[in-house]
């Protein structure tokens, strides 16, 4: 969240210039330029998501993003680091005892439900998708515990598609910059 706040602050420095742009595409281009000047690449940041390897493999990315819903990054890191020390595949995660998994991921919100969701998701990937993470938005959304934001993140970071994951922080920035006028993240993602 702190990283999103810093990004928003950088963009907000140039807010008047951005808001004076006549259309949304120009505003998005100006925002991109502003962010590019301040953050040349995401990998160069001190972001704990990157420095702890939470997205270093497609498996890790999917599991950590599923655990991140309704949870701040430090708690996700606290759960994922020990989890990824024990498991490195969907087979290993599925074989892990439910109580052991529940204990490991206890730092994240809704850990009981997420334990169940992860187990079902592993079964779906192994049995319905031949052990491979689905590479379409539609199929990702069929996985237990995967919603729009998680699917968008996977499509962007793992499959290289031009999608944007809109959470409450991104939605707030988009509304402040008058890129969208929406109250629901999914509607904003559809619009942009």
Enumerate the predicted regions with their spans.
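N-terminal amphipathic/basic-hydrophobic helices that include classical n-h-c signal peptides
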Residues: 1-11
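Catalytic cores of DNA base-excision repair glycosylases
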Residues: 13-16, 22-192
């Amino acid at each position: 969240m702190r990283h999103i706040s810093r990004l928003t602050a950088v963009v907000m420095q140039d807010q008047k210039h951005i808001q004076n742009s006549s259309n949304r595409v120009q505003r998005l281009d100006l925002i991109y330029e502003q962010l590019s000047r301040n953050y040349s690449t995401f990998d160069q940041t001190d972001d704990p998501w990157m420095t702890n390897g939470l997205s270093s493999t497609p498996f890790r990315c999917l599991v950590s993003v599923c655990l991140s819903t309704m949870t701040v990054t430090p708690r996700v890191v606290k759960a994922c680091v020990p989890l990824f020390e024990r498991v490195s595949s969907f087979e290993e995660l599925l074989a892990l005892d439910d109580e052991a998994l529940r204990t490991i991921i206890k730092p994240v919100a809704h850990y009981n439900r997420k334990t169940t969701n992860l187990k079902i998701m592993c079964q779906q990937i192994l049995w319905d998708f031949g052990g491979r993470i689905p590479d379409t938005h539609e199929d990702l959304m069929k996985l237990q515990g995967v919603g729009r934001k998680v699917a968008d993140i996977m499509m962007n970071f793992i499959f290289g598609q031009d999608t944007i994951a809109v959470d409450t922080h991104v939605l707030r920035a988009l509304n402040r910059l008058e890129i969208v006028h929406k109250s629901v993240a999914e509607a904003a993602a559809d619009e942009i």
